Amino acid sequence: MNSRWVIQKLTSHLPSCLSTVLSPSKILIRQSPNYQVSTFLLNHVDMSLLLSICGREGWFPHLGPCLHASIIKNPEFFEPVDADIHRNALVVWNSLLSLYAKCGKLVDAIKLFDEMPMRDVISQNIVFYGFLRNRETESGFVLLKRMLGSGGFDHATLTIVLSVCDTPEFCLVTKMIHALAILSGYDKEISVGNKLITSYFKCGCSVSGRGVFDGMSHRNVITLTAVISGLIENELHEDGLRLFSLMRRGLVHPNSVTYLSALAACSGSQRIVEGQQIHALLWKYGIESELCIESALMDMYSKCGSIEDAWTIFESTTEVDEVSMTVILVGLAQNGSEEEAIQFFIRMLQAGVEIDANVVSAVLGVSFIDNSLGLGKQLHSLVIKRKFSGNTFVNNGLINMYSKCGDLTDSQTVFRRMPKRNYVSWNSMIAAFARHGHGLAALKLYEEMTTLEVKPTDVTFLSLLHACSHVGLIDKGRELLNEMKEVHGIEPRTEHYTCIIDMLGRAGLLKEAKSFIDSLPLKPDCKIWQALLGACSFHGDTEVGEYAAEQLFQTAPDSSSAHILIANIYSSRGKWKERAKTIKRMKAMGVTKETGISSIEIEHKTHSFVVEDKLHPQAEAIYDVLSGLFPVMVDEGYRPDKRFILCYTGDDRNGTVS
């Protein structure tokens, strides 16, 4: 190997500012034509540094083989004459091994590991980390077992294995590593403690995570940040904010990651006052303009209902990326400005702003899209044009968009063409079938999902129960509720029980629905009583209806639906005095019925309207058409259902009711 060529190759690929990291004599070789290059080799300091830079900057294809060749040419790296040279040589070999592992050359890394003239526990840790980094988990744990059996592990080994323990399935592994750390004494290492905290919280074992934290004699900012982040991930926002407050009173100063977690806690708990206080701290310490901090602030303000403050931050930012744009777009949609969110997205496209799949996925989640199939199809065209069709999250959004716009066929097409699906994909398609009344198709898809060993979630069962309710599959609905608890260990929520009540109510089994409510393991809320009352209203059951209404009045005294539904029951039974009392009580309490809004898309434009709407610019023409349609409907056999009319005018010619 020509050493002059090696040095020239190296320095030609290094920026001028980095070329000085090599010893001056190595750089001068290029200017010394009389130098005998066969006698020149890189020392361990230069070699280790270059190997590190090569891996960090992604220069492996150009420089990796050259550096490896230079190491092979140096006899000191094979047969060190003393302990110091042996130690230095081992550093070089481990640096080379790390380079191969980090660059995804796992096969070469294993081959190098087997052929290395010297190894230590760091060498094994590098290969172990390489296995995990390249998703060779099984091979990695085989090596770990061998390391543990021979006692050839250290605290870094434990932190490496804990780095992959980030789902509930790894909870037992985390506990085993914790026990091993205690037995080996490495539990006193702060890095091991920090990793244990992170793993426990990510596995959902928040109590164990707090236990590790409470037992640590030494803590640093990473420790406290790990606990705060873990609490937020487990939706313990109030606890996270309390710990953040205690942290600020102590001697540990928060870092940017800590502030991000604290802002996430404010977002999750909608604590805008605390969020504003954190904003002031960020301004005080001069880190409020960091891009990730700005995005977190926008998210906090928008989720706390202050979209104006979020927009102010967005307009003042010096740099915009896909994350900040997605945050402000979702913020607009969540605060009732769906149309503005779409217009914002269109302006982004017109301005030539580079968008990614996450932005498109966020746009597809805007409810305004659900009223405009034309706009949804345009977004689908954009997805194809930008080559986002392989993105699972985008496809999930397309499935939901098409089904909510009434196009079940295109929802199925997107689902079947997906190159990769996750549990959300299956849930979205099952929900689409349920939404369109295709209960049997939803159940069949669920069977396919379980056959492929895709684990269902509580959302899966919610959609399935909706499907059973709409097609009257009572026994199947009960079976699914039991399967949810007994087989999959998923605790039903109020929404699941409401589906069962709705299912029984649709079938006219009102007393059975009442008995089911009485047997619930949780206190019924207004959704449950409203479902029963709605069924009683449909079937005209005064006895159960009055009971459900009374319970609903106690749970939600300001609810207009309770008054309207019980009044409907009285109307259907001809109990006009009782109906009048209900309406009188409703007026005395100042309770008003919330106005429902409908919409329709005509020629790519969405029109929204309410009952007896007179504000539309074409209102007069619309009512003329409606007046002409009613006699045609009567001729076709339509008769108005007078059971639920609160006050019938008696004019059947135009169907006027109030």
Swiss-Prot record:
It comes from the Eukaryota. Keywords: Repeat. Residues 604-634 are annotated as: Type E(+) motif. GO terms for biological process: RNA modification. Residues 528-603 are annotated as: Type E motif. The keyword Repeat applies. InterPro entries: E_motif, Pentatricopeptide_rpt, PPR_At4g14850-like_plant, TPR-like_helical_dom_sf. PPR repeats lie at residues 189-219, 220-254, 255-289, 290-320, 321-355, 356-390, 391-421, 422-456, 457-492, 493-523. The keyword Repeat applies. It holds the Pfam family PPR. GO terms for molecular function: RNA binding. Belongs to the PPR family. PCMP-E subfamily. This is Pentatricopeptide repeat-containing protein At3g05340. It comes from Arabidopsis thaliana. The gene is PCMP-E83.
